Regions:
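Iron-sulfur cluster-binding electron-transfer modules in prokaryotic oxidoreductases
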Residues: 1-156
Length: 156
C-alpha cells in the first residue's frame, strides 16, 4: 500500500491586501449569512474583500450532471469578474474544484482559455486561505467539530 501524499498548502510571500470572494450560488441562495461571516473574517485580517455583484454560478451543477454546454455558458459569465491578480477565495470545495481543475479543460481551445487558466491559478478554498495567511482563531469557548471536505483536498 502506497503512502498518501498530503495536499500542498498554498502560501503567500506576504499576506494579500485584496482578494475576490466568489460566493457560490448555493451559498447565496441558501446560506447568505455564512458567506457574509466568511467575508467578515477575511476583513478582520486586514484584507479588502471584493465581491463582484454580477457573479452567479461556477457551472459545477451542470458540469457534474453531464451538461458541459450549459456549464460552459454559465461559467463563461464569471470569467471577466476577476481582472486583478488577486486570490479568488471560494467557500466551497466543489465550486473551487470546478473552477481550479475543470475550467481550464472546459474552456480549452476557445477564446476564453487564457482567462480560465488565469482564474484557475488564483482559486483558493476559504479555509485553506485562512491557513495560508496564518490565521489563528481565538478561543471562544466550547469546541466545535469540523469535517475536512475531501473535495477541497485538490484545490489548496
Amino acid at each position: 500500500m502506497s503512502a498518501i501524499t498530503p495536499p500542498k498548502i498554498t502560501t503567500f510571500d506576504s499576506k494579500p491586501t485584496d482578494v475576490y470572494f466568489f460566493g457560490t450560488c448555493v451559498l447565496d441562495l441558501f446560506m447568505p449569512e455564512a458567506g457574509m461571516d466568511a467575508i467578515t473574517l477575511i476583513e478582520q485580517q486586514g484584507i479588502r474583500v471584493h465581491y463582484p455583484m454580477a457573479q452567479s454560478c461556477c457551472g459545477q451543477p451542470a458540469y457534474s450532471s453531464g451538461h458541459p454546454t450549459e456549464a460552459f455558458d454559465v461559467a463563461k459569465a464569471q470569467l471577466d469578474l476577476f481582472p486583478e491578480n488577486w486570490p479568488i477565495v471560494v467557500p466551497s470545495g466543489s465550486c473551487g474544484g470546478m473552477m481550479k481543475h475543470h475550467w481550464p479543460t472546459l474552456f480549452k481551445n476557445t477564446e476564453y482559455e487564457s482567462k480560465a487558466v488565469d482564474c484557475a491559478s488564483r482559486i483558493i478554498e476559504f479555509t485553506h486561505f485562512l491557513l495560508a495567511i496564518g490565521y489563528k482563531p481565538e478561543d471562544k469557548g466550547e469546541p466545535v467539530k469540523v469535517a475536512d471536505a475531501m473535495l477541497a483536498q485538490g484545490i489548496v
